Amino acid sequence: MRIVISGGGTGGHIYPALAFIKEVKRLHPDVEFLYIGTENGLEKKIVERENIPFKAIEISGFKRKLSFDNVKTVMRFLKGVQKSKSYLKEFKPDAVIGTGGYVCGPVVYAASKLKIPTIIHEQNSLPGITNKFLARYVNKVAICFDEAKAHFPSEKVVFTGNPRASEVVSIKEGKSLKEFGLDENKKTVLIFGGSRGAAPINRAVIEMQEGLKAKNYQLLYITGEVHYEKVLNELKEKGLASNMITKPFLHQMPEYLKSIDVIVARAGATTIAEVTALGIPTIFIPSPYVTANHQEINARSLEKHDAAIVLRESELTGDRLLHAIDEIAGNEEKLNQMSRLTKELGVPDAATRLYNVLKEITTT
């Protein structure tokens, strides 16, 4: 079988695609993949690092206000469709999967016009503009949140979950927290604000330093590389808590997750897939800067099952964050209950489910 994958712009669209490729390759080594992205996007560097064949098209997103740039976007889209058709005719895939981001628009649309079976994978509870557009052309729409159903034709929707869940569950031997000087016998809280960090989360962690010092749990705190020096200097002024280790970035984060008891993070789709697959209780601080506030909608879908605590960024303080951490890490019964409820929402076989949908549309 030959499969084309397209998705880009953010890690939330790219990493599920890579997790899917990895799982399918593990189960079926003879399957061939081609990844279509943009030349300047994050996906090019990440995908090529994984030694996956990569082709590029030029595309940009629509402005939400009336703008001459939208005329250019339409022209790029049409050119992107033609370029995609040439790649597809050359590669001759059995199916095409779009995982979101502007780049998959021309690719999946071109595939549908060439009568190639197509799937879009929507990671969020509130779909992006590209997937909404593509829904009318594809064979199936794979979703990760029940809330997304309402935005797509019901006969096309299938719940698969996010393949990133399969990837974290498949890690047998995780990395040890000892390399950071942390005690493996203590409850450990991981705090991070996404790949670049988040200033409001950093501010709250700095504020809670004094209260943190007396706690019997420990923190692994990831500032984001751009914030690291500034945050470290402020922490030193406050007096560093001995039960917190501060790092700018955590490479291969999934390798450490099985050693983590509680997470404080943004509510991106990839993070949610990981914590639910592993059953890690999480305090979500959704980013208010994303389209249609979809991160808060993602987080609330877990909160309503008592599987997460949600703190709005606008209400975030050091005291509130420390209280929320105490509520879970300082209460064994609550931690175990939330872990169980979180895991019940996980889809550890998401990659296999998506592959089964793909097989279904290529054999009918």
From Swiss-Prot:
It comes from the Bacteria. CDD domains: GT28_MurG (cd03785). Belongs to the glycosyltransferase 28 family. MurG subfamily. This is UDP-N-acetylglucosamine--N-acetylmuramyl-(pentapeptide) pyrophosphoryl-undecaprenol N-acetylglucosamine transferase. Pfam families: Glyco_tran_28_C, Glyco_transf_28. InterPro entries: GlcNAc_MurG (IPR006009), Glyco_trans_28_C (IPR007235), GlycoTrans_28_N (IPR004276). Pathway: Cell wall biogenesis; peptidoglycan biosynthesis. The gene is murG.
